[in-house]
Structure formats: C-alpha cells, structure tokens
Amino acid sequence: LILRRQSLMSDTLSHVSLAGVAVGIFLGQSTTWMTLVVVVIAALVLEYLRVSYKHYMEISTAILMSMGLAVALILSNKAGSSSMSLDSYLFGSIITISSEQVRALFVIAAIVLVLTLLFIRPMYLLTFDEDTAHVDGLPVRLMSLLFNIVTGIAIALMIPAAGSLLVSTIMILPAAIGMKIGQTFKSVIFWAIGIGLVGMLSGIFISYYWETPASATITLIFIAFFGLVSIFEPLLKAE
C-alpha cells in the first residue's frame, strides 16, 4: 500500500467496512458477511475511480471515505438502540471476536502469505511500474482489483478486533518501519511481518495486564518502534 502510494486506501476501506457493519445491523443480518460484500464492491469502485483519476488518486479515497461514513451514520441512526453495536466496531475488542472471525482471519492470512510467495515478482513490477508490468504481459487491471479486494477483506476481518479507527494504522506502520530497516523489497516484507507479529503480541500482552484497549496499545507500540527506528536510522543505513 505504501509503495503504491495508496496508504489512505486502508483508511477508506475501513470506513466503508463500517458502513457494511451498519448495513448488517440495520437489516438484522450477519455483520461479518455484509461487511465483506460491501468491501468487495467498494474495492471494485475504488479501482475504477483510481484509473479514472489517475493523477488525483486522493479523490477516489475521499469519495468512498465520505460515502462510507455517511451511510454508517445514517443507518446507525435509523437502527436506534442497535447503534451501540456499531460503536463497538469503532474501537474493537479482541476479547469479543467470535471463533468464526478468528478462523476467517487465519484463512485470509494463509491466502495472503501464499499469494505473496507465488506472485512476489509480479507484485514488485506492479508496485513500482504498472506500465512495465503491462508490457511484460501481466494482467495489471486484474491484479490491482485482486490486491484491493484482498486488502479490503483483511481490513473487514480485522475491524472487530482492531476497530475501524485504528485498523489502518496497524496495517501501515509495520510496513513503514520495515522500509526504514530493509534494504530490498523482500527484506522490507519480512521485516514488516516480523515487526507486525512482535507489535501485535506485545500489545495484546500489555493491554491484558494494564487493562487498556488492545488496538490503541498496539498502535502506540508501533509508533514507539517507528520513533526508535527513525532515531537510529542513520546507524542502520550505515551498516
């Protein structure tokens, strides 16, 4: 997301996911499945807008983000007392997620890992130069769509645990830290994965004993990591 200059896409899809939650609550349906449906549709629309406004990509994110918030607010207002359920998705709670959601997270994590290992070179080309990827015979539009959809599904499944307000931070910061440490594309990926695991596990551990919100604790840990790496970055680059 960062290398493709689409960091705000995670924010956008998290807000759209909140709209999916509101739709589920309003219709009395499963919020998980409604969120996934809404996110997939949003991912398709986001790719269309990204291509339409190629030189102004922030326009597409602003349009969908505003729409997601507007739909979520209106439907939560119409849902009446059920709006309290929507509030829990704003900040999330790792202790309230269902076993079904945990299994879904493991499945999407496995899918992302397999896709990364199988298509790391095509993703490298797609990330840095779409024109070269197109000349190389890669299905650029399809790959971009799948990238958006997988990202959206991951965000939708993370929201019950991390909350829509902080899920984008949890997704972006490990990669941003990895970019400061890693020297190659692959090393950045592995550093981001390692930092993400350490930050998530330590955040859950600390939040349990300090009785603080897990998502906020994890976010602050990642920010602390980012600050430390930024301070010592000259030494890391020198090595």
Indicate where each model-derived feature is located.
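Small-residue-rich segments of transmembrane alpha-helices in multi-pass membrane proteins
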Residues: H15-G28, L64-S76, T96, V140-T151, ...
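Short loop segments and helix-boundary regions at transmembrane helix junctions
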Residues: L1-S82, G178-F190, S207-W210, E233-L235
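Membrane-helix/interface signature in polytopic inner-membrane proteins
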Residues: V114-F147
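Cytosolic-side transmembrane-helix boundaries in multi-pass membrane proteins
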Residues: T212-E239
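Transmembrane helix-bundle core of multi-pass membrane transporters
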Residues: Y53, M57, T61-P122
